[in-house]
């Protein structure tokens, strides 16, 4: 096959029904077409791959997938995709998602049509889309204590004590407000159909260069979601945090102390997602959110 890709990485979701069969089909397909296959070591260790399918494949960690591969296929749900994206985006390697999970906003190719949909993509016939990521830094006593990336959102939230937290928000060093609430969601357009949507935030078309600030159960009913350019720097100063945390894509977190500052910016590398040529963003929204179809 004359392909712009040569080394294909595969990330699999552990403890998923039929994941071994899906991986077997994909690995066999790629080998038959002459591609070099790299497997995420976690998937191999968690028995997502039949032992015989690892023959002739390279087994590496997710960071090394970004180093050695020129395309990564994610078999799983959106959670698996989010985890892979944070590891691979720094290497600017494109990702394609195959849905082995449930909702599938990001992993859109049904596994039943996996090889039929992938073949044109591997031949160079695809739609490429760039998605922005969040880069967050936790500043404690004037020093950077932690850093993290997020494709969906960074969420400041109250801890197990259950009490409201209080914090100040600044955009480009301009004071916005003091808020008492259960927390604040800073969402990318990709994350606008996730936690942000459940908290009353707007849906943002995936290609927009914007963030939204979405309060979680604010004490003041006048606190509403705000959309800002993704060139903005967001600063959150925690004044009464209790045992608050900052969560990243709902998969990792940092504990927060009083007077900590969380600085949020757009990450310098966008995530590049590849879609089949028949991909339509609003069709995906209709299917996943069960919107009405055209009447005429």
Swiss-Prot record:
Catalytic reaction list: NAD(+) + ATP = ADP + NADP(+) + H(+)
Molecular function terms from GO: ATP binding; metal ion binding; NAD binding; NAD+ kinase activity
Cellular component terms per the entry's GO annotation: cytoplasm
Cofactors named for this entry: a divalent metal cation
Residues at the catalytic site: 78
EC number from the UniProt entry: 2.7.1.23
GO biological process, one term: NADP biosynthetic process
Primary localization class, coarse: cytoplasm
HAMAP family hit by this protein: NAD_kinase (MF_00361)
Protein family (similarity comment): Belongs to the NAD kinase family.
Protein name, entry field: NAD kinase
Gene: nadK
